[in-house]
Amino acid sequence: MSAKKASQPMLNTTGSLQEGEMGKMFHGKCLRIVSPESPAKLYCCYGVIMVLSVAVVALSVALSVKMTPQISTINTYAACPRNWIGVGNKCFYFSEYASNWTFSQTFCKAQEAELARFDTEEELNFLSRYKGSFDYWIGLHRESSEHPWKWTDNTQYNYSLSIRGVERYAYLNDIGISSARVYADKRWSCSKLNSYSLQCKTPFSPM
């Protein structure tokens, strides 16, 4: 009996040791499954990191495109020569002295221009407003009262504003356009196309 009783604690101790070893083994397996070092877990983590990285890059690109100003190129005309005034694509000159129509046209020719020509209502309004109280020769003439009015380049005058009088040379006054003889002394206005254009880059943000 004593031998049996003595052997029982030893058996219990051995069983406990075996149970402890098995517990450690299962615990280690569980840790390996849960541990981030397992291949499945690592692949999952890498996948999440890649998705987040792509999302961050895409968001950064979208924000940079939205906030970066876009450049729009607009054609504008360069400054006119000194003492000339720019309107649209033309430059206009207003004399401070009076002379006849022929001399006035010769002066404008020397400036690589012609006696003033208007092609739009804006240009006509500008000429009428800027001339003040003085009369100014413009580039309209005709062979006789029976012939149509023409510009200095011989293109026909087609504007709706009529020209008063029966003379051959036109000038701008307070009531519109009138005609006078060639030797009458009046101030004059020259005009020329401004062929020099600049590209002006203006930034704007997309909506």
Curated annotation (Swiss-Prot):
SUPFAM superfamilies: C-type lectin-like
Upregulation: Down-regulated upon infection with rat cytomegalovirus.
One Pfam family, short name: Lectin_C
Modified residues (Phosphoserine): S7, S16
Keyword Glycoprotein: yes
Keywords: Cell membrane, Glycoprotein, Lectin, Membrane, Phosphoprotein, Receptor, Signal-anchor, Transmembrane, Transmembrane helix
Membrane topology, as annotated: Single-pass type II membrane protein
Parts of the chain on the Extracellular side: 66-207
Top-level division of the source organism's lineage: Eukaryota
Positions of glycan attachment: N100
Ranges in the topological domain labelled Cytoplasmic: 1-44
Signal sequence, start to end: none
Stretches assigned to the C-type lectin domain: 87-198
Cellular compartment(s): Cell membrane
Keyword Cell membrane: yes
Major location (coarse): membrane
A cellular component term, taken from the record's GO annotations: external side of plasma membrane
Functional note: Receptor for KLRB1B that protects target cells against natural killer cell-mediated lysis.
Name of the molecule in the record: C-type lectin domain family 2 member D11
Gene responsible for this protein: Clec2d11
